[in-house]
Amino acid sequence: MIHLLALLMLVAGVQDTTLAVIPRPVHVTRGTGTFLLTPATVVVTDRATRQIGYQLADWLGPATGYRLPVSGAPGTAARTISLRIDPTLARLGEEGYRLTVTGTRITIRAFRPAGVFYGVETLRQLLPPDAFRQAPVPGVTWTVHAVEIEDMPRFQWRGAHLDVSRSFMPKEFVKKYIDLLALHKLNRFHWHLTDDQGWRIEIKKYPLLTAIGAWRRNSLVGVQRGYADTTQWVYDNVPHGGFYTQDDVREVVAYAQARFITVVPEIEMPGHAQAAIAAYPWLGNTGQQLEVLAHWGVDQNILNPSDSAIHFMQDVLTEVLALFPSRWIHTGGDEAPKAQWQTSPVAQARIRELGLHSENELQSWLTAQMSQWLAGRGRSLIGWDEILEGGMEGLAPNAVVMSWRGIDGGIAAAQAGHDVVMTPTSNTYFDYYQSQDLAKEPLAIGGFLPLETVYAYEPVPPALDSVQAKHVLGTQGQIWTEYQRNPKNVEFMVFPRLVALAEVAWTPAERKDFADFTSRLRRHVARLDVLDVNYRKLN
């Protein structure tokens, strides 16, 4: 129904390439005249949109110097910006909106507040780029061309990931990242909080997770020759670490909620767990005292499948659930080598006890236990596609698969009735190089992912029929931070590729056009400049 409506909007609309709005709206009709924003303009809201009205006034205030009043009625104002819930717009869904600009009024209406918020984000892009500045800009006429836009997203999951384990990122940057997601109408922030190289979230029941697990001696910064020869690895000899307190997490979650973004935490299990094992050696399989890992790649140390380790995972998730209202809780599940389980008396006893036939089946059993535990608390487990390797038996029906090793995992999960988020390395891994001229590129993990390849991505595999395709929730961009050591490095790798993926996730496939996108992008980067985003310059 959503796709049919989008097509009807496209047929009925007038194609417009003069507005540099990203993602490209479904339907745009240009009018005549302009709306002039003045100090006397009133932001008019109803009760459901009041906070969005305050946000809009706060966002416009620094650059314009105007303190726009927010009111439930226009009074005698000659020019108004009206934000309203409209029950007749149910056909636009939870996040769609209608924006109308005339000479005297800007009206944003939607079925739900999220739609009003996205209409506001579009309005901000209709203003001059200087509207994003945080200080008064003299001499600017704050005008918006007359237009009517009717818009709605193609996918419900429009995400961006951030790995803060390999390289810890300050809380203020995390909030800036969330602002940039909101600007591009992305609604899922996947926060990768734990891994071999660092545990980044305070868990009160297990204080050593951050006292020990959040810190490492140094970091791998390069390889002189072949990666397989560890004698050629180069370290920086600089201690690295950090973590977010539970108050920090609450602050970030509230900040995202105000921007209609769901924060999806990732707590890795059973692999990528060396930081946890370094803090509590009884979680491992060897009993050895480990250090937090300082190099990259797949590590052999994984959590053991004992009752005590399972209770640990549940204890951690109990505190995580109290911090994150997200329906989805990511438990990783990727890159969990089974060599230690093959020689572990505990793991082998568990396999015999359950009548399993392999270590992969043991991981699937463990994932099923966690998915059912989460389902019993009203949440859905989401994991990387390796969670399918031992079969889907026992996996809670509401469990979601994130397909990163190509699209086959997503296809298999969707065909089995599970929701999926499509995240293949080929189109969504922003830690890959942006050019094949590596001498001009900062160090990256490898690969090659140019902007055009991101934009060309189609998240719904042709192998799925119309019923199975409904299980594709959407797509998401990933940034792993092995070599992205600071916020500016992250921004360089993510932007503008995330801008392209935002359009993939929002705009109907038949409305996409790379030449048109790049034309709008060349004007859109003026906004990124104002926002001090260290994006890769366009060719």
Question: Language-model segments: which ranges?
Answer:
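Feature activates predominantly on carbohydrate-active enzymes
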Residues: 90-314, 318-328, 369, 373, ...
